[in-house]
Amino acid sequence: MSYENFIGKQEKFTENINEKQVQKIVATLQSKQLKNGDALPYLWQWCFFNEALTPDKLGRDGHPKLGLDKNSFFPSFGEVNRMWAGGRFNFIAPLIIGEDATKITTIKKIQEKQGKSGKLTFVTLEHCYYQKEQLKIEEEQDILYKQPAPPKLTSDVVAMNADYSEKMQPDSTLLFRYSALTFNGHKIHYDFPYATQVEGYHSLVIHGPLLATYMINCFVKNHPDKQIINYSYRGMHALCVPDSFAVESKIIDNNTAEVWINKNGFVAHSGTIHFK
């Protein structure tokens, strides 16, 4: 199928980086207190710029329906499951709390592949974040749409020895609160019967962007003097509550660090950070 008419389509969102919303993120992630005028921490922009759709515009999984009408941003890919596969960031300057910001989203690429479980459709979105007409953050997000199949829950990539390691065990309350912060209706994060009986997970699924946030936070907490220039990350398999895991990091050279989620000695999610 040709998706040529969708390539280059754009959406624009303008929102205040509201201090009250920031305080909710602080409470959820147990982070340090922040106020108006402070820099928004890395990846917290995901808790802003999220479209408020009415229930009739949502699909069976709680995500926006695809190809709803001729004006839809996304085409229809049929009866598919959605996964946040990974992404890349260039950090030019931080967003500032208390100021208005604009996000412009562009469909950059739609690519079909054949996988072991059937057809895979990869969508790459570009998100550009601005304040006072200055580009602050460039992001590329990879979304995977796949035919219903048992989810991958293991990895054969052995975790390396880490410089820093922090044990974590998210619970369902944390998942619910993060879903609320990001206005994410995906049922795999809060609807146990749907997650287990429809999509085949053994429990509620931990958000990919939350895990990406944990990984970058691991580096920031242990290297607060370093400025991150860019960050790439990807998920290798899903993690569910109440699974415990370690968030780990290791500096590889003068301006590169690897970060990952260690689940029983194997890598579940991974990322690369370039810093100065």
Specify the residue positions occupied by each region the protein language model found.
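Hydrophobic, proline/glycine-rich low-complexity stretches
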Residues: M1-D100
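HotDog/MaoC-like acyl-thioester-processing domains
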Residues: M1-Q10, W84-P170, A238-K276
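A contiguous, surface-exposed recognition patch within enzymatic or periplasmic domains that forms
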Residues: S2-Y42, D156-L211, C218-K221
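Residue-level preference for alpha-helix termini and adjacent loops
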Residues: N5, N16, Q45-F48, N81-M83, ...
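Short, glycine- and charge-enriched coil/turn segments that flank and shape catalytic ligand pockets
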Residues: S31-D38, Q131-Q134, D225-K226, D253-N254
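Charged, low-complexity, helix/coiled-coil-prone segments
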Residues: L43-F48, P64-P75, T124, P148-Y164, ...
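Catalytic-pocket segment enriched in acidic/His residues
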Residues: A195-I252, E258-T272
